[in-house]
A protein has these predicted regions:
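C-terminal structural segments of small proteins and small subunits
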Residues: 75-92
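Short S/T/G/P-rich N-terminal loop/turn motif that feeds into the first structured element of a domain
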Residues: 1-53, 60-70, 93-106
Length: 106
């Protein structure tokens, strides 16, 4: 079964107001067996508009990723984030099929 990911691009406009959101997330993510794959870090934006923070959060599967986002706990916490940051967030299903390097040229 393919894993799933939240991919977020974040521009925090109120650091102090954002802190309670960040502090509440570990308990929520633990409940849904999520883990950070990317959490900030150095980045380059060769195309499109950049934001100052980028995150990728991994979930066991797509249904779990959606359930976490829709959970009452996250929805309550989301209001804090929305008041203190501009965010683009997508939920995507991963791919666990064959890779190009797995094919043998004939």
């Amino acid at each position: 079964m393919a894993k799933a990911y939240w991919i977020g691009r974040v521009e925090v406009n109120n650091e102090e107001g954002y802190k309670p959101y960040a502090a509440a997330n570990p308990a929520i993510f633990k409940k849904f067996n999520a883990k950070f794959v990317v959490r900030g870090g150095k980045h380059e934006c060769p195309e499109g508009q950049s934001r100052s923070r980028n995150v990728v959060i991994e979930f066991p599967d797509y249904a779990t990723a959606v359930a976490c986002y829709r959970s009452p706990e996250y929805q309550a916490n989301l209001k804090i984030r929305q008041a203190n940051a501009i965010t683009d967030l997508i939920i995507v299903e991963g791919y666990d099929g064959p890779q190009p390097q797995d094919f043998v040229a004939l």
